[in-house]
């Protein structure tokens, strides 16, 4: 992570726990969006046994404001700080991402010790300048799958992937994903992808929302 505050796992945990994904989807977006349970979305991939990836993998998201504050307190203690400020970058021409960003601002600002600075820009500037140059702390982004395989999402977190703008890097994750590419047994490959997502989600390399 380029931001030393976000390099702290407890700070990342606080951010994820502060988001009420169910409330966001049902009462704010109201467009059929579903709360994310992990990095690979529901309805994308079916296992060799005919089961949805999301049903076989664990759920890695939850909303718990008290736990979020506790995680932030611990993170601040580890960092030796009483307060941190994070920039939240979003495109004003990207609906509903602008509404989503405001929701996040309110959620994060409710935590004592965390200040949010909103960085409003355009989609083009967000992708080709801010993200490409690493000029962000938190950024509201999305991904459209290229195919119905979990790797269309999982490869985004590889150390050398050009779309890994946050520069999260985990050697074990990279190793498992390398095995995914070469594994010929469909069931074994499926389990490797579940294992890889577990590493990514537990370390909060990305924070899936909806």
Regions found by a protein language model. Give the residues of each.
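Extracytoplasmic/peripheral linker and loop segments enriched in polar/acidic and small residues
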Residues: 10-13, 25-26, 59-61, 115-127, ...
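Alpha-helical secondary-structure segments
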Residues: 1-37, 83-95, 184-204
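Extracellular/periplasmic catalytic domains that process cell-envelope and extracellular macromolecules
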Residues: 8, 79-81, 131-134, 148, ...
């Amino acid at each position: 992570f380029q931001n030393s505050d976000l390099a702290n796992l407890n700070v990342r945990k606080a951010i994820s726990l502060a988001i009420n994904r169910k409330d966001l989807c049902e009462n704010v977006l109201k467009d059929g969006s579903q709360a994310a349970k992990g990095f690979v979305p529901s309805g994308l991939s079916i296992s060799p046994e005919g089961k949805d990836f999301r049903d076989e993998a664990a759920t890695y998201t939850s909303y718990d404001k008290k736990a979020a504050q506790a995680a932030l307190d611990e993170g601040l203690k580890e960092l030796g700080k009483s307060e941190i400020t994070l920039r939240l970058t979003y495109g004003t021409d990207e609906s509903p991402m602008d509404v989503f960003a405001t929701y996040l601002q309110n959620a994060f600002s409710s935590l004592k010790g965390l200040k949010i600075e909103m960085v409003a820009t355009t989609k083009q500037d967000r992708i080709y300048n801010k993200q490409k140059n690493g000029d962000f702390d938190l950024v509201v982004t999305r991904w459209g799958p290229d195919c119905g395989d979990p790797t269309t999402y999982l490869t985004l977190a590889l150390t050398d992937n050009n779309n890994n703008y946050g520069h999260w890097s985990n050697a074990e994750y990279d190793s498992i994903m390398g095995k995914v590419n070469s594994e010929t047994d469909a069931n074994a490959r499926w389990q490797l992808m579940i294992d890889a997502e577990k590493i990514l989600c537990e370390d909060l390399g990305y924070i899936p929302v909806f």
